[in-house]
Amino acid sequence: MSELTAKENIKTADTVKRITATAVMAALTTLMTAYIFHIPVGVNGGYVHLGDTMIYLAAAFLPLPYACAAGAIGGGLADLLTAPVWAPATIIIKMLICLPFSSKGTKLVTKRNVVALFLAFAISATGYYIAEGIMFGFTASFFTSVSGSIVQ
C-alpha cells in the first residue's frame, strides 16, 4: 500500500511541476506579447512582439497539452489586454502553433523543432489571414495580414 502511495505522490508532484511551468510560460508569453517589445504594426490592431518565442520554448519543453494551454492562455490574455477583438482567434492559433514541436528528447534544438518554427509561421500567418478576412474582408486582409506576419 505504501508503494502505491509513493508512486501516486511522485505522479502528483510531476503534475504540479508541469502545471506550474505552464503557468509561468503563459505569464511570460503575456508579458512578452503585451508589454515587452510591443510595436504596433498595420491598421487592424496587429503588433510585433516576442511572445511567440515563449510559446515556441513552451512547445519544445512541455508536453503538448501543457504547451497548448500555455500558448492559448498567454496569447489570449495579451490580446484581452491590448486588442480584445483578436482574443478568440489568438487562442485557437496559439494552440495550433504548438502542434509541430516536440518535447520528447533532452535536446532543445533538434531538426524537428527547427522545421517546426517554419510550420508554426505558416500556421500563424494562415490563421490570422483567415481571422482578419472574416473581420475586415479577405481582399484587405491579404495585404495587411500577410505583410504583418512576414514582419513578425
Task: Tell me the role of every PLM-derived stretch.
Residues 1-152:
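Loop-helix junctions at membrane interfaces
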